């Protein structure tokens, strides 16, 4: 695997010098300063590429070229936003960048309720608490009909939890959910958030798939023409939330994408932490079935709790993800490609490290502190080395 590292640009507290010292050779980044939907110019792409290369690294993957909300709702100026997206892909290829991670999650990208969940060893992790989320949705957001998405027990527990929250607790929970986590391209006030949810009131899973198909049928032929590998990131969490449909959550969703546009440019980001939240997702089977279309991997693990919809970010080699079997399946796919004469490695980045050691005293991007990811990268690197030596060194 190609060892990469997500970097949020010049304002990231983790420097490119840090990235290189961690042992990564590739950088995963994006032009976050360009508004959603606008074309990434060759000039702006080359500026970022030069910064990365001056640090002795390469820009391996774009994460992400965000998709404008008008495309997801099939409203407004969606045709122009699609044309802009097509041009951005052409410009990236002109600059030598050919792997693009993206997602089709409506309104919110990845979602957590607690950004400082303290683990038994004193380090901090990200957590999604189903009951806290229900308390937010029913008692703070007050989304009409939200009760239908929860069990009677969850509704009662959410009411109890809300009753014990201070004003600061409520503000923090709201901020964590709607203000935008690292990599998210949108942040909202509560009123703005309600208005954006309203835009989806008539969009169910079938309609969102229909809108996604319009995007794929416009974008994938351009990607195929210019040589871009599109790698969709799964929903996080991989299930409907806030009354919004989610359509990249299961192996069935992956198959739907392939059936909709059967091009090798139409590929996947294997995010083990996102897919792995669902106990019914067999990660190794996903890799084996769709291996030739996996162009990027996010390796992390999560741990489901007593309520199976509550989870926290586990250490990379712990939790519900069998990281050994996952890495073995990825390495096997790389060797299959090599046997076909393809030498390209699959870019991998350690995802969502714990905040630990000296980083506990620093301001960090939630999930993206340096030391926790350094630990994760070293652990995954060791797993891969052992697999390569044991099975492929002859």
Curated annotation (Swiss-Prot):
What Gene3D superfamilies would the database entry show? Divalent-metal-dependent TIM barrel enzymes
Q: State its cofactor.
A: Fe(2+); Mn(2+)
Q: What is one Gene Ontology biological process annotated in the Swiss-Prot or TrEMBL record?
A: D-glucuronate catabolic process
The gene from which this protein is expressed is: uxuA
Q: Which reaction does it catalyse?
A: D-mannonate = 2-dehydro-3-deoxy-D-gluconate + H2O
Q: Which UniProt keywords apply?
A: Iron, Lyase, Manganese
Q: Which family does it belong to?
A: Belongs to the mannonate dehydratase family.
Q: What does this protein do?
A: Catalyzes the dehydration of D-mannonate.
Q: What is its EC number?
A: 4.2.1.8
Spell out the protein name for this chain: Mannonate dehydratase
Q: Which HAMAP family match?
A: UxuA
